Amino acid sequence: MTLNEKIREKLEEVDPLVFYGQAEKLDETVLWNYIVFFREKRSGSENRTSHTVTFHVAVVRENEIPEGLEETVIEKMLELPGMKLGSESTYAYTIKPGTGAAVEVLDIPFTKARKGR
């Protein structure tokens, strides 16, 4: 099983609607309550024998993200061997097109060291 498959499996324990990269076309009538994860960058070590991959998990909720959901997502991701929490989570806000509904997005970074170039 690939790392992306393992991440998806863990996140689906929190929310059944999980996307990789970006959310696919969602109908305006569907609640925007889902999770998206993606890779941001790959950084090599100084000795070039390993590298670190930075992942982001974006929790998207109409209106607001319930208290405790951030901690649940973090706990699930940290169950993956070698996964570490990044330094700073950020919140962003937007309006769902055609509805006027507020949408809150929480971006949580994680890193995973891997052997090899």
Task: Please provide the spans of the model-predicted regions.
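Short, charged/polar low-complexity linear motifs in solvent-exposed/disordered segments
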Residues: T54, N63, L85-G86, E104
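Small/polar-rich, solvent-exposed N-terminal microdomains that initiate assembly or binding
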Residues: M1-S45, E62-I65, L69-T72, G98
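Short secondary-structure junctions
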Residues: P16-Q22, E79-T90
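Short, charged interaction patches at domain edges and termini
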Residues: M1-E9, L26, E40-T52, S89-R117
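Aromatic-residue hotspot detector
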Residues: F37-R39, P81-M83, F110
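Mid-chain, well-packed structural core segment of small domains
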Residues: V57-M83
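General N-terminal targeting signals
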Residues: I35-F37, H51-T54, I74-K76, A102
